[in-house]
Amino acid sequence: MIARILDGRTCAEKVKARVKENIRLLQEKGLPSPGLAVILVGNDPASATYVAHKERACQAVGIRSTVYRMPNTITESELASKIDECNRDSNTHGILLQLPLPAHIDPANLLERIRPDKDVDGFHPYNLGRLVQRRPALRPCTPYGVMTLLTETHENLEGKHAVIIGASNIVGRPMALELLLAKCTVTVCHRFTRDLAEHVKSAELLIVAIGKPGIIQSEWIKPGAIVIDVGFSRLSPNKIAGDIDFETAKERASWITPVPGGVGPMTVATLLENTLQAAQTFL
């Protein structure tokens, strides 16, 4: 068996085309384009690269983006004031606080400070609570991007045993909520999980989001499983790896995402979707 490739770049282009068309329709009605505020703290090269990518994606679909670059020495209260300013700005429909933040700043406090209806990352407790209640509003970008990508398989997910490796607030936990919403039976594995291999072997849908290359051995993968690799590690300037060895895993899976070119583009595309959705509540 050779797995079919779940191409995140192609799927993301479909999402972006829909967003661009909807923005064009807004403009035809004389309404303003959606506005996104991105708050970037410090000079972390990876964060700067991600923000630049998001800026280009916004420009391509017609979203106005403004990046507020803050020094690494900024205090939590100063950063909170900037968020408050964006909350009040009627031309800003979405707010994104680029993570990670410097060690002296508590991200939870600041993510909660963003207005829920402008929380385009989907991390506010209100938006996560809506997902828990099966009434989603703005949804976390990576998990919802994965769900959109899974539609490309045309597989019925109802009743499938989905195993998530990783329990972060950004991916693992909201991913579990999304899969429950899709009527999967969900197992979440984390650093205290015993017999990880046995859990992986039972997965009909395997989602790995740890950031440790090779953490999942390919022989653990159930033949015919759908495999989603959210991991992203830069091994050298020119080499990026996921959490699973793609070349050996594709011999067992029915569908698999590459790294790069799998989940990453879907995260950005979902951010654009969320920004449009947020704008539509104001316009």
Curated annotation (Swiss-Prot):
Family statement drawn from the similarity comment of this UniProt entry: Belongs to the tetrahydrofolate dehydrogenase/cyclohydrolase family.
Keywords per UniProt: Amino-acid biosynthesis, Histidine biosynthesis, Hydrolase, Methionine biosynthesis, Multifunctional enzyme, NADP, One-carbon metabolism, Oxidoreductase, Purine biosynthesis
EC number, UniProt record: 1.5.1.5, 3.5.4.9
Subunit structure, as described in the record: Homodimer.
GO terms under biological process: L-histidine biosynthetic process; methionine biosynthetic process; purine nucleotide biosynthetic process; tetrahydrofolate interconversion
Binding site for NADP(+): G166, A167, S168
One Pfam assignment: THF_DHG_CYH
Membrane spanning stretches: none
Organism from which the protein derives: Coxiella burnetii (strain CbuK_Q154)
Pathway named in the protein's UniProt entry: One-carbon metabolism; tetrahydrofolate interconversion
Example of a GO cellular component annotation carried by this entry: cytosol
Free-text function comment from the UniProt entry: Catalyzes the oxidation of 5,10-methylenetetrahydrofolate to 5,10-methenyltetrahydrofolate and then the hydrolysis of 5,10-methenyltetrahydrofolate to 10-formyltetrahydrofolate.
InterPro entries reported in the protein's UniProt record: Aminoacid_DH-like_N_sf, NAD(P)-bd_dom_sf, THF_DH/CycHdrlase, THF_DH/CycHdrlase_cat_dom, THF_DH/CycHdrlase_CS, THF_DH/CycHdrlase_NAD-bd_dom
An MF annotation (GO) of this entry: methenyltetrahydrofolate cyclohydrolase activity
Gene from which this protein is expressed: folD
Catalytic activity line of the entry: (6R)-5,10-methylene-5,6,7,8-tetrahydrofolate + NADP(+) = (6R)-5,10-methenyltetrahydrofolate + NADPH; (6R)-5,10-methenyltetrahydrofolate + H2O = (6R)-10-formyltetrahydrofolate + H(+)
PROSITE patterns reported in the protein's UniProt record: THF_DHG_CYH_2 (PS00767)
Record protein name field: Bifunctional protein FolD
